[in-house]
Each structure stands twice: as structure tokens, then as C-alpha cells.
Amino acid sequence: MRIGKAAEDLACEYLVRNGHTVVERNWRSGHLEIDIITLDSAGIHFVEVKGRVAPVTADPEENVGYRKQRRLASAARAYLNSEDKKSLIDQKEAFFDVFSVIFEGGKAEVKYFPQAYIPINT
């Protein structure tokens, strides 16, 4: 199984267990992509998933830098502005979350960072 897909599967399972409803996976528009989009009682979540196989030199979540954050914010805006998604704009809040998975010896270490960042000037 592909590392990215396995990490996204774990992220979806975790999020559903914690009150989220998954509405999209691997949403794309041109060069923009969002790994997972969920809804919960607080609003809509745009989730970036990072998966790595141990040993790692840096935690996967550290790979969501400023440029990636800007691209994700642009993707979220494109998603919400698409004609069939306009009703989601009524959600209370939009959140940008990061989900990290490190695979080692048949086990997975998962970390969820809700509201990992707030996009600015996108």
C-alpha cells in the first residue's frame, strides 16, 4: 500500500472516531489539492496529511511550511467557491489541520494538529 494512502486512511479513521464527517478525499482543482476535507460541529476542516517511514530526520508535520500553507489556503478558497460547495460557506469556521503518521515495524505513530495554522495574506 502506498505510504500516502495508508496515512490518509489512518487520518480518516481517527477523524471519524473523533466526531468528524469526511466529505472529500484528495480533492483537486488544477494544481491545487486538499488531502482530506471534514465537517464537525465547529466547522469545516482542511487537513494536510504527512506520512513517513522511520527512521525520519524531521517530524512529518514540519514539512508543512509557509508555501504549502499558502497553497492549501488557495485550495480551500477554490473549494469553497466551487458552485456545488457554496452551502459549506455557511459553516461556523474554517480550520487548517495537519495529521502526521510515522510508520515503523508494522506500527504507526499518529499525531493530529487541529488548527495547526491560520493562513495570512493568501
Regions found by a protein language model. Give the residues of each.
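Acidic-basic catalytic patches of nuclease active cores, encompassing PD-(D/E)XK
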Residues: M1-N26
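Hydrophobic "anchor" residues on beta-strands that sit immediately upstream
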Residues: T21, I44, E93
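Short, glycine/acidic-enriched loop or turn micro-motifs at the edges of active sites
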Residues: W27-S29, G51
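Short acidic/glycine-enriched loop/turn segments that link adjacent beta-strands
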Residues: S29-L32, G106
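Protein kinase-like catalytic core scaffold
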Residues: L32, H45, F95-D97, K111
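Conserved catalytic cores of phosphodiester-cleaving nucleases, focusing on short active-site segments
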Residues: I34-T57, L72
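Catalytic cores of nucleic-acid endonucleases
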Residues: G51-E104
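Short, low-complexity, polybasic intrinsically disordered segments
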Residues: S100-T122
